[in-house]
């Protein structure tokens, strides 16, 4: 299940987060399909002064945008999440609008809502070519026939680079391996009446949330592992990759220290899969410079936190000529031709 994170270092990403929350409610109502949302609240943990100061800045940004976040003490952290050892922390920033959702349910809800509003989508229909016509529109070639479109948007995900290459465009994104673990049942969770909050520890580079009667623990290692630098195979079917726990061993040491129950609990499954980053970690959205009617929305690594806001921003940009917020930190135009694979 997807984890919703509301703390982000740039204002543009912060501004689109509320749009995602509104989108979740809208697509449930329109589609009749649950997105499996658990609004547990979540906290962002500061273990030293550097991260405490960082969270103070983030809270200031949140207040500026009307988002409600508040600091709580380590004691309050332990009261809300008794598996956490509070002695490692100075403070935590609490967000009562955080939580997680079911990515499969959310995807179906988006698809059903789109169809209600007149959109069409075609599964198992690969795009093999994109050809611009003299009037500026595009022919999108598929094995089932051509689709003519006024505007095309590269939302290729792991295949964003390959879709761009169809038109001679270099999209500077790179898939990276990402690990997370699912634990066996933890007695304290099994006995709890309410679902536990989710959390992020910035120094440890870990995030965690309840999964059934255990925990999901994810890591962001400081030395990430690129995947398929030469290009994503067209026949890749989102298969999982071989886990490499040595790669995240130092992150796990932090986790076992700060959530002691993890050291005493079995690992039910270790999961490793690729997802895509831009060079600075932010999405790359908007019209591609030098092209007509060619847009992109790629590198959205925090998909279910940012996806609805990215979609709204793109729609405003296309329909009104500009988005309602300043998206400089996400504009694809911030990277020029110099952002090549060699770079």
Regions inferred by a protein language model and the residue ranges of each:
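Dinucleotide-binding Rossmann-like beta1-alpha1 core, especially the glycine-rich loop
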Residues: 1-80, 203-207, 212-216
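Helix-loop-beta segment of a Rossmann-like dinucleotide-binding subdomain
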Residues: 33-44, 58, 78-117, 139, ...
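C-terminal catalytic lobe of FAD-dependent flavoproteins
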Residues: 203, 212, 234-343
């Amino acid at each position: 299940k997807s984890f919703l994170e509301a703390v982000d270092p740039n204002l543009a990403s912060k501004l689109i987060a509320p749009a995602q929350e509104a989108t979740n409610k809208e697509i449930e109502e329109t589609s009749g399909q649950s997105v499996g949302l658990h609004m547990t609240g979540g906290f962002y943990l500061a273990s030293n002064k550097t991260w405490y100061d960082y969270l103070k800045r983030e809270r200031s940004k949140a207040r500026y945008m009307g988002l409600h976040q508040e600091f709580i003490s380590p004691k309050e952290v332990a009261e809300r999440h008794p598996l956490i050892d509070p002695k490692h922390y100075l403070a935590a920033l609490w967000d009562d609008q955080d939580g997680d959702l079911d990515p499969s349910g959310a995807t179906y809800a988006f698809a059903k809502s789109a169809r209600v509003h007149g959109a069409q989508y075609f599964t198992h229909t690969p795009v093999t070519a994109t050809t611009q016509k003299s009037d500026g529109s595009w022919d999108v070639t598929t094995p089932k026939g051509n689709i003519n479109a006024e505007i095309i948007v590269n939302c290729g995900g792991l295949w964003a680079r390959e879709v761009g290459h169809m038109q001679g465009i270099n999209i500077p994104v790179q898939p990276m391996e990402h690990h997370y673990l699912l634990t066996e049942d933890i007695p304290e969770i099994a006995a709890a009446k309410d679902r536990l909050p989710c959390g992020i520890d910035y120094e440890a580079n870990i995030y965690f949330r309840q999964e059934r009667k255990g925990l999901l623990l994810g890591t962001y290692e400081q030395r990430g592992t690129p995947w398929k630098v030469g290009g994503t195979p067209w026949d890749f079917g989102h298969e999982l990759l071989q886990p490499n726990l040595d790669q995240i061993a130092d992150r796990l040491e932090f986790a076992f220290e700060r959530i002691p129950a993890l050291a005493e609990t079995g690992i039910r499954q270790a999961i490793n899969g690729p997802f895509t980053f831009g060079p600075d970690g932010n999405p790359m959205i908007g019209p591609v410079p030098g092209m007509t009617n060619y847009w992109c929305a790629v590198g959205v690594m925090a998909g279910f936190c940012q996806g609805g806001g990215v979609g709204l921003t793109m729609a405003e940009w296309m329909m009104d000529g500009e988005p309602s917020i300043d998206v400089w930190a996400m504009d694809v135009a911030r990277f020029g031709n110099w952002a090549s694979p060699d770079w």
